[in-house]
């Protein structure tokens, strides 16, 4: 059960950071990184 909690916290923190960068910077940078 602890593993699920830790994985959930990790995913949530990564998601928050990802969305923060996504909304702060223009999507052009993300497309360039993907290519």
Curated annotation (Swiss-Prot):
SUPFAM superfamilies: Photosystem II reaction center protein T, PsbT. GO terms for biological process: photosynthesis. The chain crosses the membrane at residues 3-23. The keyword Transmembrane helix applies. InterPro entries: PSII_PsbT, PSII_PsbT_sf. It is found in: Plastid, Chloroplast thylakoid membrane. Keywords: Chloroplast, Membrane, Photosynthesis, Photosystem II, Plastid, Thylakoid, Transmembrane, Transmembrane helix. One of its GO terms (cellular component) is chloroplast thylakoid membrane. Its main location: plastid. It is a single-pass membrane protein. Belongs to the PsbT family. PSII is composed of 1 copy each of membrane proteins PsbA, PsbB, PsbC, PsbD, PsbE, PsbF, PsbH, PsbI, PsbJ, PsbK, PsbL, PsbM, PsbT, PsbY, PsbZ, Psb30/Ycf12, at least 3 peripheral proteins of the oxygen-evolving complex and a large number of cofactors. It forms dimeric complexes. Found at the monomer-monomer interface of the photosystem II (PS II) dimer, plays a role in assembly and dimerization of PSII. PSII is a light-driven water plastoquinone oxidoreductase, using light energy to abstract electrons from H(2)O, generating a proton gradient subsequently used for ATP formation. This is Photosystem II reaction center protein T. It comes from Gossypium hirsutum (Upland cotton).
């Amino acid at each position: 059960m602890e593993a699920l909690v830790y994985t959930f916290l990790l995913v949530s923190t990564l998601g928050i950071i990802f969305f923060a960068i996504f909304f702060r910077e223009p999507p052009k940078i993300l497309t360039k990184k993907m290519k």
